[in-house]
Amino acid sequence: MKKSFLLIFLVFFANLIAAQTSNSVLSQGDWFKFSIDTTGVFKIDKRLLQQIGISTSNLNPKKIHIYGNGGNLLPVLNSDFRNVDLQENAIYIEGESDGVFNNNDYILFYGQGPHSWIADANTQTATHNQNIFSDEAYYFITVSNTDGKRVQQAAPVISLAPQQITTFDEFVFYEKELTNIFAVGNQWFGEDLSFENTTTVVLPFLNALPNSPISIKVSGATVSSSTTSIGVQLNTQDPFTFNFPAVNANSLTKGYANHG
């Protein structure tokens, strides 16, 4: 009885997977894959289309579609929402009205990279979300018989008192997935300071305002039978030091002390 039940379950599960695959947008047409490593607006010109394998001869730009869900990590909980298939992105194509992809025509689309920032309106801060599996996000281009999804023109914003924005808050992160203390799980750290006890990180801040405030968040961990500390130096200043308590480094079930 147990063997019969298991066989029926496996057949049902296999049919479910097959049904999902056959309904995917990828099941029909020719698809061309490309990657991005950051979030922003990207430009695709005629040369790039040719480089990824798309023939631009007799190409009607109105029939171009771009699909992709961004590069953020999938939810951990099965109950959380996730797209079951690739979603079409609204794009803008310069010069598509004549039905020909000319040399000066190009595509603009907004792509989400593998890493992201999550804003908190209550604390007026942002938290960095690192994709621990990939430093690239992938998108797909296809050409079909139907018109692609396009960016719609929004209604103009009329303001009696226009504001000129001259400054903004810049967010920069440095995170390398190099060290896993227990060689298990998804908790990774960067440089190992056991031997080379100093490391230098250069963060690019272009056109930074002099004497403007800076907020720094640093995470670290130690496994040591004695108390240890990690000092953080910003330019020539020493803003703070992490003090780590001792842990039983010889135990098979040892833990680690961390700050972040």
Per-region residue spans from a language model:
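Structured catalytic cores of large enzymes
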Residues: 20-37, 52-260
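Bacterial Sec-dependent N-terminal signal peptides
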Residues: 1-22
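Ligand-binding face of N-terminal immunoglobulin V-set domains in extracellular IgSF glycoproteins
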Residues: 40-44
